């Protein structure tokens, strides 16, 4: 039995459940190593089952150990029969399912108690093992190189879409399987929109260019943002940039095992507030990354939780002034017992090209 399944069973026992159905495909992969568009896991103390369909049966047999593997069209009926034959009664399920899927569960598991579970596997995924960390580090190195290469590509007259496409294609050329998310590429006043979509707008001298991008490598993601300037930079632009950079670096300097979620957000936010730009920092400081681009933990001013060694988090302060421009700097960091390790290594000093 692998360590992830054992941790799953320990948590399941704490919740007094006889078994749990997992149908989130990334959680299925996390537990089994199986990657496909159809897969449902059922884990109980005595049996661990993966149900897929005939398209994936060969792959599942090759990729998965420690699970019984079934190819069935009705995965819930298959799992329900197993649960009932075992005499189980209290069955957990992931609560982010459609209404129709829930109705199917009610029919299949009639007579058994169905107990919704929130972020059951996602909570286990917060702490990365050495293999996961190495994979994320590789994804980050691809993003770093793509950014470096983009600096030579960007010229006045290139459009936001052309630059975004360059980043996307370059990451694939460097070994990425795909993108973590649709690349955000915003220049000039568009950079004041934190999640702007790239447009057919040419970049112009004197503009800020914000690039938020990442790639997939062996199913794990990177997530990096850099802001650069084309031709020249004003005093106000430089002041705002250096304020964001100071906030970003302050969190890198202080993030470590045991730091409270509230402080993780407060440390960089206080710097931006003290500089007079607090109202222009309009989003959270960061989130976890891994199999998903946004995953646990998320940070709240009211949370009493603490960050832990093995978490991989984003550090992404920003300032956005409507109608003018914006700045965001984002890094991926690995939390350790004594501090944090910076995984995104692309330069962050104020760059003018």
Identify the function of each model-found stretch.
Residues 1-353:
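Active-site neighborhoods and metal-handling regions in enzymes and metal-associated proteins
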């Amino acid at each position: 039995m692998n360590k992830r399944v054992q941790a799953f069973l320990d948590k399941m026992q704490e919740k007094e459940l006889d078994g749990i159905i997992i149908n989130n495909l990334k959680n299925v992969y996390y537990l089994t190593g199986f990657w496909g568009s159809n897969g449902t896991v059922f884990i109980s103390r005595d049996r661990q089952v993966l149900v897929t369909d005939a398209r994936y049966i060969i792959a599942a047999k090759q990729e998965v150990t420690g699970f019984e593997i079934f190819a069935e069209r009705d995965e819930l009926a298959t799992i329900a029969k197993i649960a009932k034959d075992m005499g189980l009664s209290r069955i957990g399920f992931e609560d982010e399912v459609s209404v129709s899927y829930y109705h199917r569960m009610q029919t299949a598991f009639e007579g058994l108690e169905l107990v919704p579970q929130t972020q059951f596997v996602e909570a286990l995924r917060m702490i990365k093992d050495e293999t996961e960390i190495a994979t994320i580090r590789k994804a980050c190195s691809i993003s770093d190189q793509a950014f470096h290469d983009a600096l030579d590509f960007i010229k006045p007259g290139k459009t936001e879409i052309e630059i975004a496409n360059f980043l996307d294609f370059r990451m694939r050329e460097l070994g990425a399987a795909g993108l973590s998310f649709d690349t955000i590429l915003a220049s000039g006043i568009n950079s004041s929109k934190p999640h702007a979509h790239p447009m057919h707008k040419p970049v112009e001298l004197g503009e800020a260019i914000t690039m938020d991008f990442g790639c997939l490598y062996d199913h794990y993601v990177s997530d990096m943002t850099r802001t650069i300037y084309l031709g020249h930079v004003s005093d106000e632009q430089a002041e705002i940039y250096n304020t964001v950079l100071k906030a970003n670096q302050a969190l890198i300097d202080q993030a470590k095992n045991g730091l409270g979620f509230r402080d993780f957000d407060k440390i960089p936010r206080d710097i931006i507030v003290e500089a007079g730009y607090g109202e222009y920092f309009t989003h959270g400081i960061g989130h976890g990354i891994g199999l998903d681009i946004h995953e646990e933990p998320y940070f709240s001013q009211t949370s009493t939780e603490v960050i832990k060694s093995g978490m991989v988090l984003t550090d992404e302060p920003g300032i956005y002034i409507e109608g003018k421009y914006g700045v965001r700097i984002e890094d991926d960091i690995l939390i350790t017992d004594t501090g944090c390790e910076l995984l995104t290594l692309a330069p962050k000093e104020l760059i003018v090209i």
